[in-house]
Design a protein with these regions (language model features):
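Conserved N-terminal phosphate-binding loop of PLP-dependent enzymes in the Aspartate aminotransferase
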Residues: 1-253
């Protein structure tokens, strides 16, 4: 059996309806922007396999650094312990994160980062003895595939099978040009009528919704409304962070 046939015997793939989807391509190696399959056919990885766009495949600098670290310390529990690489990374990240950030909590990926942020928002008020259990999100938002992240997402393609199981999320319109006041009014109304813990948003651009853009000034207005009403804000920069909008973070605008 070739690689694809062996794969199909055991594996389910994400975002795939296996009854109708084309068979996956069996890739055996990559270098920079190129991939090669098991027949040595060359492909341009035009989507950077989602996650390697800053550095390409098989980056020798990264490979050498990983090898060096593995020969020193491959893992230590982060509860009750710390280590040089994580402290150094945090020190470097604080130099580029927006200036209002003070602490870092590490997670596995974008979805679980959103999951943690939502849990922190809810537990913040729980710890204070304040009943706030609603999260505010934009219409047609996408925040990930774990449960709270799906709850905050507004695209039914990803969430319809799980409706009725989610935390309480209320949606407001995106403040696109000409509809800013509608968004402001909706946010104010939700805050006045619900016990809102947090507002999660994709800053300046909604990717999965179809690259829906809105202005920094509109986001600033929404954030001010939240701050005035003791509602925490969560900037989901999984798609926009680290230079993808021009500045290091979209929240820097």
């Amino acid at each position: 059996m070739n690689l694809t046939e062996r794969d199909q015997k055991y594996n389910w793939h994400p975002y795939t309806q296996h009854k109708t989807a084309a068979l996956p391509i069996g890739i055996i190696k990559g270098k920079d922007a190129l991939l090669w399959d098991e027949n040595n056919k060359e492909y341009i990885d035009a989507i950077a396999s989602w996650w390697v766009n800053p550095f390409g495949h098989s980056n020798s600098f990264i490979a050498d650094a990983i090898y060096k670290q593995l020969t020193t310390l491959e893992h230590v529990l982060f509860g009750g312990f710390t280590h040089e690489p994580v402290v150094k990374l945090s020190e470097q990240l604080m130099k580029v994160l927006p200036s209002n950030q003070q602490k870092i909590f590490y997670s596995d990926n974008g979805s679980t980062a959103v999951e943690v942020a939502i849990k922190v928002s809810l537990q913040y008020f729980y710890n204070k003895g304040i009943q706030k259990t609603t999260i505010i999100a934009f219409e047609n938002a996408f925040h990930g595939d774990t449960f709270a992240a799906m709850a905050a997402s507004g695209i039914s393609f990803y969430t319809q099978a799980f409706q009725g199981m989610f935390i309480d999320v209320v949606r407001i319109p995106v403040p696109v040009k000409g509809q800013e006041q509608e968004s402001y009014d909706a946010l104010q109304s939700v805050i006045e009528n619900k016990n809102c813990a947090g507002f999660i948003f994709e800053p300046l651009v909604q990717g999965a919704a179809g690259m829906v853009m809105y202005e920094p000034e509109s986001l600033d207005k929404l954030i001010r409304i939240c701050q005035e009403n003791n509602v925490l804000t969560i900037a989901d920069e999984v798609m926009t962070g680290f230079g993808k909008t021009g500045k290091t973070f979209a929240c820097d605008y």
